[in-house]
C-alpha cells in the first residue's frame, strides 16, 4: 500500500531487490530505500505479483543489507521536476545537478514516461533544420519533428559530430526559440569532460540541457536518462513552443543496460541475449519525437549508436532502423582517409528529406541537385572498384572525371572543419562547384533552367 514501509527484503542481486509480504504495489511505482546508516536511495517497481515486488535500485545495490534495509512504496510514478531554469544546466542520469549550481525549483513535475500521443493529433514533420554540416543538410536533410539516428562504430568521431550538431543546429527564417536537450549514457569521464567543455566554451550551454550518465554509474540509470531528457524536451516544446533537438548518445549502452537488467530478472533472452521486448522499449523512446497539431513546438531526435563490429544487421541498429526515419552512417574507410565527419552518403538516408527542402524551405534546386550529387558520387565509387581490376588506363575521359569528382566530393563536400558551420546556401553552391567537374551532358537529373541559373559557368557570366 502507498506509504507503507517494509523491512522484508529477501534477496538482492545485481541492481535488483526482492521485497516480500507487500500489498497494493503497482508496476512502475517509485520506491524509497533507506540503509542502516540513513542513506536514501530511489528505485522503481519492475514486477509485482501476489505479495512480492521486484525493485530496481537506481543508485545500485552496493552496501545494502537485506536485514537492515527498509523500503517504502510511495504510490507515485517516477517524475522529473521541470523548469525553464534547466536551460544552461548539467545534470546526472537521474536529474540531479552536477554543475555546482543550485537545485532546480520546479514549475511542475512530469512523469518520465510522458503522455502517449494520439496518432491523429500528430502533425506531419516538415521544415528544414540546418546543422551546418553539408553531408547532412545537402544530402540527408534533417526535418523538424523527425527521428534520424546516426549509425557509428567504435573509435569513430561520433562524439565530435554530436557536439558539433548540438552547437550549430538552428531553424532558418523564423524567430523560433531553439533548444538542445543532450543525453549521454554510459560515457567515460573523458567523454563527459569533452561534452561539458564543448558546450561551455562555445556558449551552446545557454540554450541546452545536459544529462550525463557515466560508465561507472549504475546501469539502471541508463534506462531512465533518455526518458528524463525527453520529458524535459516535451515540456520545452509543448509548454513553451520551442523547437527542441534531442541528441541521445550512445543508445548501444542503453540497450546493453536493458540486456543486463533482463538477465538479472532471468527473462528468456531474444536475439543475441537482448530481451524480446527491446523493439517495443526502443519505440517508447523514439516515438516521443514529433509535432502536435495546434502546438508550435516540436521535438526532433538524433539518437547515436555504435554498431558492434560495424554490423548494421546487429539487433540494435536493425530495430532502430524499423522505428526511425532513415539513418546517417559513419564510414571507417572515410575516417582512415582523414575525412571528418566521415559520413558515407550512399547508405545514409533521410526518409522525410523531400518534405523539408525545395522552394520556400531551402532552395528550389536542392532536391534535384542532391539527386545528381548522389548519382555522380555513386558512379565515381563504382569506377574505383573497376580501376582496381582493369587499371585507370582502360577508363574513358568521362570516367576519369567521375573519379576526380568522387575524390573532390569526399575532400571538399563531405569533409569540413569541426568548427565550420556552413549555411545551406554555401552547401548547395559547393555542390554546383563540384558538378562543374563533369560534362554538362552528364547532368541528367537537374532541369536545364537550374543549370543555367546555378552552374558556375553561367553564374559567373551573369555576374
Curated annotation (Swiss-Prot):
Q: How does it sit in the membrane?
A: Peripheral membrane protein
Q: Which GO terms describe its cellular component?
A: plasma membrane; proton-transporting two-sector ATPase complex, catalytic domain
Q: Which GO terms describe its molecular function?
A: ATP binding; proton-transporting ATP synthase activity, rotational mechanism
TM stretches of this protein:
none
Keyword terms, alphabetized:
ATP synthesis, Cell membrane, Hydrogen ion transport, Ion transport, Membrane, Transport
Pfam families annotated for this entry?
A: ATP-synt_ab, ATP-synt_ab_N, ATP-synt_VA_C
- What is the stated purpose of this protein? Component of the A-type ATP synthase that produces ATP from ADP in the presence of a proton gradient across the membrane. The B chain is a regulatory subunit.
Q: How does it assemble?
A: Has multiple subunits with at least A(3), B(3), C, D, E, F, H, I and proteolipid K(x).
**What protein name applies here?**
A-type ATP synthase subunit B
